[in-house]
Amino acid sequence: MFNGKNILITGGTGSFGKTYTKVLLENYKPNKIIIYSRDELKQFEMSSIFNSNCMRYFIGDVRDKERLSVAMRDVDFVIHAAAMKHVPVAEYNPMECIKTNIHGAQNVIDACFENGVKKCIALSTDKACNPVNLYGATKLASDKLFVAANNIAGNKQTRFSVTRYGNVVGSRGSVVPFFKKLIAQGSKELPITDTRMTRFWISLEDGVKFVLSNFERMHGGEIFIPKIPSMKITNLAHALAPNLSHKIIGIRAGEKLHEIMISSDDSHLTYEFENYYAISPSIKLVDQESDFSINALGEKGQKVKDGFSYSSDNNPQWASEKELLDIINHTEGF
C-alpha cells in the first residue's frame, strides 16, 4: 500500500514518528517520507539516522496552515502525530494547547483537502474519552474534527480516521523513562500518584503497526482502538525496581485513577473485531454509505452489548511484571 507513495508525518521527530519511519523503511519502498516538525535540532539528529534518499525534512508548525499545505504537495497519506500532550503543561498553558491540538488539527484537515491527500489518520489518546483535563478535551475536539471532515470531503477522495490508544512504552516524557532516570540517579524510592491507578499499555512498535493496518481497513470516520493490556502503576514500579519503596504523592492536576478508551455512551456505535474495536461515527456521513460492521478489508465485526465500556480497570487483559519488562526491553532494542 505504501510502495511508491508519498507519506507525511506531522510531529515526525517524536517517538512515534521515528518508529513509524523505521518500520516504513524496513518493510516498504515509499517514494517520499516527509517529516514535518518545528524543532530543527531534532530534525538534524533524526536526519543523521534516517538519511535515505526518500527522506525529506520540513521545518514547520501545525499552527501554520500555509506551510502545511506546501509540505503536503503530492502527498498520498498523512499521519497526524503532532500534539501538545503533557497534561500538567496543558493545564497551565491552556490556549497554547488549544492552538496546537484543535486549530492545528483543522489546519491538517484543510491542507489535506487542498492537496488531494487520499487518507489521513490522526493519533488520539485514551484521555479523549470522558475527558477531565484540557489535553483530553482538546483531543476529543480534534477527534470530532477528523470524523466530521469526512462530511466536508463529500465526493472528494480524502478520507479521515482516528486511532486511539493508551500509554506508549518509552515515549518521551512517559513514566518508564522517568522511573529509569530516578533509578539511575540512585533514588531510594519511586513516586506513585495512587496505588489504585491503572493504565493501558502499548509498545511503540505495536502502536505503529496498528496505525499501518488502519490505513488498509478504514472507510473514513472510524475511531480505531486496539485490544491492549492494562497495568497497575505499582506493578510497573516494582518490575523496574523491586527493591525500592514507593512514595505516594497524590494525583496530579487533570489525572484520572483509570483511563477509558470506550465509554458506555458509545457502546451503540462500537463494533468488536478480532484484535481491535471500531467506534462508528455518531453523525450520518453525507455521500458515504459505509457499513462499519465490515471494514474495508472485508473483515466482519460484532456489535458490542449495550452499556459496554473499555477501561483500564475492567480490561480482561492484564500485563504481568515479566510481560512489562519484556515489552520495555523489546522497545528499547527496537
Swiss-Prot record:
Reactions that this protein is recorded to catalyse: UDP-N-acetyl-alpha-D-glucosamine = UDP-2-acetamido-2,6-dideoxy-beta-L-arabino-hex-4-ulose + H2O
Coiled coil spans: none
InterPro entries: NAD(P)-bd_dom_sf (IPR036291), Polysac_CapD-like (IPR003869), Polysaccharide_Synthase-Rel (IPR051203), PseB (IPR020025)
EC number: 4.2.1.115
Binding, substrate: K85, N167, V175, T193, R252, E255
UniProt GO MF annotations: lyase activity; nucleotide binding
Residues involved in NADP(+) binding: 13-16, 37-42, 61-62, 81, 85, 123-124, 135, 139, 168-172
Phenotype caused by lack of the gene: Cells are non-motile and non-flagellated and accumulate unglycosylated flagellin intracellularly.
Catalytic machinery residues: K127
Keywords: Lyase, NADP, Nucleotide-binding
Cofactor(s) recorded in Swiss-Prot or TrEMBL: NADP(+)
Role, per record: Catalyzes the first step in the biosynthesis of pseudaminic acid, a sialic-acid-like sugar that is used to modify flagellin. Has both C6 dehydratase and C5 epimerase activities that result in the production of both UDP-2-acetamido-2,6-dideoxy-beta-L-arabino-4-hexulose and UDP-2-acetamido-2,6-dideoxy-alpha-D-xylo-4-hexulose.
Self-association state and partner proteins as the record states: Homohexamer.
Family: Belongs to the polysaccharide synthase family.
Name by which UniProt lists this protein: UDP-N-acetylglucosamine 4,6-dehydratase (inverting)
